[in-house]
């Protein structure tokens, strides 16, 4: 389970906090409790500087109550059949609230993945949810003949505020890309290990690799990464150069580099042809394991 924070100074998403959870064994917990714990960590660290973005899978009354209790700013995409109260106190489904209303804002936007330009229309109003007494605002967005409903607790009274909510939600695709990378490239969709000790070791190794890859994205290593990509993962097309998916080619380049040039770990481990040093290392490791578990 991960939470990503967006830094607007460089426009990139950064990993804020990550945590493993399970429903079995001695570390068993509930998914909602783990999500609430991560939310509280982010709220304590950044307060109202962060806007928490949630997709339709998190749109529910209990989740809204947790966000209200933590006093967090949020943008949630809702299913159109969810029930809200209008400003006149009428109980209606989301699609009925904005039915027949003229859109209040129009703009041509650009798809960041394909570069396609498309028209976008917005309409907004104030609403309330049955599970929360907090004043909410819903933004109805029509893009490519599809309609989405976004709710937020930030005030939406002007066109600029409505566009801010819309573009905040659209940045979720960078976070979805990171989730897909963790599930596919790092093989975290379903680790199949029976013993808890082996599973914890595997997860620790994966997190070590993940942290190493993320550390290479630091601007201080830009020249090193560029040289590595030119050497082992060269791309000539403009689309391949401009695509915002840095971890994929970086891992491919490292894999090909280490296949051709195996890294030497003699600075950490003694050479295998020195049996005395190897036995001394094994003895020290056993002593550390005995004292520290």
Give the location of each predicted region.
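Single, function-defining residue in the core of a domain
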Residues: 4-293
């Amino acid at each position: 389970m991960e939470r990503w924070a967006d830094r607007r100074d460089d426009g990139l998403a950064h990993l804020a906090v990550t945590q493993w959870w399970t429903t079995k064994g001695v570390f068993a917990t509930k998914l909602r409790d783990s999500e609430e714990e991560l939310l509280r960590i982010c709220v304590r660290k950044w307060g109202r500087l962060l806007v928490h973005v949630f997709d339709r899978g998190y749109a529910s009354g209990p989740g809204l109550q947790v966000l209200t209790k933590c006093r967090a700013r949020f943008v949630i995409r809702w299913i159109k059949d969810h029930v809200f109260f209008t400003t006149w106190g009428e109980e209606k489904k989301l699609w009925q609230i904005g039915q027949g209303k003229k859109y209040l804002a129009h703009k041509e936007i650009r798809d960041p993945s394909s570069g396609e330009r498309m028209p976008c229309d917005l309409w907004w109003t104030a609403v309330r949810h049955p599970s929360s007494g907090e004043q909410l605002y819903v933004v109805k967005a029509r893009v490519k003949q599809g309609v989405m409903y976004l709710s937020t607790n930030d005030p939406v009274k002007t066109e600029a505020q409505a566009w801010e909510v819309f573009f905040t939600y659209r940045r979720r695709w960078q976070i979805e890309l990171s989730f897909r990378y963790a599930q596919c490239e790092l093989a975290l969709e379903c680790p199949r290990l029976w013993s808890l000790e082996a599973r914890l070791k595997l997860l620790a190794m994966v997190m070590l690799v993940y942290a190493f890859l993320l550390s290479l994205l630091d601007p201080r290593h830009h020249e090193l990464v560029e040289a590595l990509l030119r050497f082992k993962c060269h791309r000539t097309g403009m689309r391949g150069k401009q695509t915002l998916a840095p971890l994929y080619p970086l891992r491919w380049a490292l894999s090909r580099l280490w296949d051709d040039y195996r890294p030497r770990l003699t600075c950490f481990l003694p050479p295998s042809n020195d049996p005395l040093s190897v036995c001394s290392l094994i003895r020290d490791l056993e002593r550390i394991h005995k004292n520290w578990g």
